[in-house]
């Protein structure tokens, strides 16, 4: 694939062009609709320490970094995100709370819900959890043991012990738990390739 040699932003723009020109129109759960392509892959060379952020659209990169750190922590509760001003995951537990508790036609606002999440640890524990989303799958993949499999620790150990392995992979797509997640993973499988010690 020639695009794999392109700068990350050029890969993204090329993908957007292909989706616009040849993508199939599809309906989605949000009612917005999409143009879709099947099986597209983007490859990023991270060996120089760069991060593939876009400059052609507004990116809330600080929130993205906070979210990634939250994933890597293994947490599944929105409380740490909300405490840092990251609201990207609030809608799912808020909708669940409103469906269970709000009087008809008077749901609690996002601001009021987030304030309760911050102020009340018990409320956050009950209503702020997203189920076994990214962080849980990455750090506690269920295997019958109390802590599960820490895919991130296993990945790092594998890269250090056997850099040439083709098995430097982790995933968030756990078919057995998709229905328990607030939202199934959008980005779900990652593979690392070590070449010449990098």
Kindly label every feature range from the protein language model.
Residues 1-198:
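Terminal, non-catalytic protein-protein interaction segments that mediate quaternary/complex assembly
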């Amino acid at each position: 694939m020639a695009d794999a040699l392109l700068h990350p932003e050029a890969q993204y723009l090329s993908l957007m062009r292909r989706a616009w020109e040849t993508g199939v129109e599809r309906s989605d759960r949000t009612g917005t609709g999409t143009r879709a392509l099947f099986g597209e892959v983007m490859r990023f060379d991270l060996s120089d320490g760069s991060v593939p952020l876009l400059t052609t659209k507004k990116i809330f990169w600080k929130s993205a970094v906070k979210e990634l750190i939250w994933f890597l922590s293994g947490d599944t509760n929105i409380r740490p995100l909300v405490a840092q001003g990251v609201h990207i995951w609030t809608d799912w537990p808020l909708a669940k709370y409103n469906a269970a508790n709000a009087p008809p036609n008077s749901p609690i606002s996002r601001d009021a819900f987030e304030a309760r999440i911050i102020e009340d640890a018990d409320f956050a524990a009950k209503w702020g959890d997203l189920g076994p989303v990214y962080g849980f799958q990455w750090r506690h993949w269920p295997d019958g043991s109390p802590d599960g499999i820490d895919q991130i620790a296993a990945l790092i150990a594998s890269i250090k012990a056997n850099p040439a392995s083709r098995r430097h992979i982790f995933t968030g797509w756990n078919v057995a738990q998709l229905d328990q997640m607030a939202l199934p993973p959008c980005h779900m499988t990652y593979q690392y390739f070590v070449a010449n010690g990098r």
